[in-house]
Amino acid sequence: MSEQNILKTPKGDRIAIVSGLRTPFAKQATAFHHVPALDMGKLVVNEMLERLNFNKSEIDQLVFGQVVQMPEAPNIAREIVLGTGMPVSVDAYSVSRACATSFQAIANVAESIMAGSVTVGIAGGADSSSVLPIGVSKKLAGSLVDLNKARTLGQRLKIFSKLRLKDLLPVPPAVAEYSTGLSMGQTAEQMAKTHNISREDQDALAHRSHSLATQAWADGKLKDEVMTAHLPPYKSFIEEDNNIRKNSTVEGYAKLKPVFDRQHGTVTAANATPLTDGAAAVLMMSESKAKALGYEILGYVRSFAFSAIGVEKDMLMGPAHATPIALDRAGITLADLDLIEMHEAFASQTLANMKMFASDKFAQEHLGRSKAIGEINMDKFNVLGGSLAYGHPFAATGARLITQSLYELKRRGGGLALTTACAAGGLGAAFVLESA
């Protein structure tokens, strides 16, 4: 292990994570069908604080994110503060970094603690694929503005006369990159072809993810980090993730047809993450504050890094770019890690990133490094399953990865973990965590 570099405050305090919690993750239009992301965010933050019997007056800041924005509540963080009984003086702002949003929220709180401006903070994210901001066409939107300014019936009728039936159709949120028009699935398909990721290998990874997640729930390993969510009108509840295939078989995956390239593709609904609803949060503070309040520390943020690459090709290669930076900042190598948690947006994207971890050619041509960071030991990789099984509420996944890693390190008696994710826009994130 090379020289250690640990994130600290000016007073020498490490950045501690005291608690992490999430809702169960639910497939679109199931358990959280009519529950907005804001309500899920309030639910998980309030439950986390209640479990700790935490004095809300101790909280200095809340940073939260949401990828699929709610127009009526653009600052989800502030609404969570106001909706959970925290003092109105608690600072709150929202962030968005696509699928790495809660990674960004956690990094922001960590930086505030390091700067000494915050002692206690909450970070996290929530997203709903069931309660969506359905928009209108640009032509209808422009006409509505013009109607508001029209003064006579004749002017209004003239505006209406220019509209066609197609202009009145609802417009769902975009699923493609604004700059390229490519969807995440199309990029996943491109990465599979470019890096020779077979359908069989993708299906095998998906089967592994579902099998390990099934076992994790059966063994009770997730009970402390996943709350039971009681839903209005409080006649039902959800206590486990409902996307996990408990009877997963490799043969079952082979039956599905490709989605994004129907003739020659390999990416299917089974080896990709589904649209998912859920929320996750972590409670952070300086090490000395945690000890002064008498709370057990789950772990520490050792380092973090973000990366950005082109979006035309290999847009989801963020982990392979961000991880070497985070490892260098932590003063460690890949071999020093006890756990590796990588967001499985698609099996093809995950396997392509794993390949690049071990590729000297990739390191030399894309990272400016003489050699690769190393091959991933599968005994350390996504040991409880990953996003392919749990699902992926965009803004919540980073907090899930970090919480899940710290609890697993604790069960194993300590160590170091890497959590990393790709994100839309060619972005990537990586965190190195240290068990308390």
UniProtKB/Swiss-Prot annotation:
User: Which cellular components does GO assign to this protein?
Assistant: cytosol
Keyword Calcium among UniProt keywords: no
Write down the CDD domains for this protein, in alphabetical order: thiolase
Pathway membership, UniProt: Lipid metabolism; fatty acid beta-oxidation
Keyword tags:
Acyltransferase, Cytoplasm, Fatty acid metabolism, Lipid degradation, Lipid metabolism, Transferase
EC number assigned by the record: 2.3.1.16
Q: Which residues form a coiled coil?
A: none
One molecular function GO term is: acetyl-CoA C-acyltransferase activity
- Pfam families xref list: Thiolase_C, Thiolase_N
* GO biological process: one example: fatty acid beta-oxidation
Subcellular localization:
Cytoplasm
What InterPro entries does this protein map onto?
Answer: 3-ketoacyl-CoA_Thiolase (IPR050521), Ac-CoA_C-AcTrfase_FadI (IPR012806), Thiolase (IPR002155), Thiolase-like (IPR016039), Thiolase_acyl_enz_int_AS (IPR020615), Thiolase_AS (IPR020610), Thiolase_C (IPR020617), Thiolase_CS (IPR020613)
Reactions accelerated catalytically: an acyl-CoA + acetyl-CoA = a 3-oxoacyl-CoA + CoA
Function (record text): Catalyzes the final step of fatty acid oxidation in which acetyl-CoA is released and the CoA ester of a fatty acid two carbons shorter is formed.
**How does this protein assemble?**
Heterotetramer of two alpha chains (FadJ) and two beta chains (FadI).
Q: Which NCBIfam families match?
A: AcCoA-C-Actrans (TIGR01930), FadI (TIGR02446), PRK08963.1 (NF006516)
* PANTHER family (UniProt xref): ACETYL-COA ACYLTRANSFERASE FADA2 (3-KETOACYL-COA THIOLASE) (BETA-KETOTHIOLASE)-RELATED (PTHR42689:SF1)
Q: Which HAMAP family match?
A: FadI
What family name appears in the similarity comment? Belongs to the thiolase-like superfamily. Thiolase family.
The name on file for this protein is 3-ketoacyl-CoA thiolase
Q: Which gene name belongs to this protein?
A: fadI
